[in-house]
């Protein structure tokens, strides 16, 4: 039986360009044992399997898979799934993932999630001194035993930076927009940020000294795909 995959792009710019592709699948249609194979088949950096909220509930449950493995938390899948649920007419306040309970909110065309900084995977953070150095970085030059987050300021006073992320350890050579890495860099710098990542994806973060980081972005739909 063919499985329907809603294809989204998460963290687009204000014109709906760029963004990180995401597959969203109704978890009731797929046995847990089959999810990893489907995530690998889909080819997205992450695929999220969502258990829809019960009638009258504002909580959903989800699991997240890269092409290689299941992970307890990721940013762009939780933002994307939260947007997808609102589009279906079932907006939520919380999304339960293996790492914990993600807080969800909606602000105009922005969908936001709040998560603990320690839920995000560990990244090797590389502070670079110029946009040229960032652009010249080659994923092949970085060890594949950990994800690498490269960044440089574009406007330090405004909290604006440019970033790239390499995650060969998760089966992703370069990720276009990484919510979990945005959480880590926000916690690392202890300030609100506007992050342009990859080709032009846009992520907004809000830092809290209590260990929570809010990640917000725009989402667009690229239609529906079928997996056999």
UniProtKB/Swiss-Prot annotation:
Against Pfam families, the record matches this protein to: PhzC-PhzF (PF02567)
GO MF, one term, reads: isomerase activity
**Which GO cellular component does the record give, naming just one?**
cytoplasm
Reading the lineage from the top rank, the first entry is: Bacteria
- A single BP term in Gene Ontology: biosynthetic process
Among Gene3D superfamilies, the record links this protein to: Diaminopimelate Epimerase, Chain A, domain 1 (3.10.310.10)
Q: Which InterPro entries match?
A: Phenazine_PhzF-like (IPR003719)
Which PANTHER family does this UniProt record tie to the protein?
ANTISENSE-ENHANCING SEQUENCE 1, PHENAZINE BIOSYNTHESIS PROTEIN
Name the record gives this protein: Uncharacterized protein Rv2716
What is the scientific name of the source organism?
Mycobacterium tuberculosis (strain ATCC 25618 / H37Rv)
Q: What is the lineage of its organism?
A: Bacteria, Bacillati, Actinomycetota, Actinomycetes, Mycobacteriales
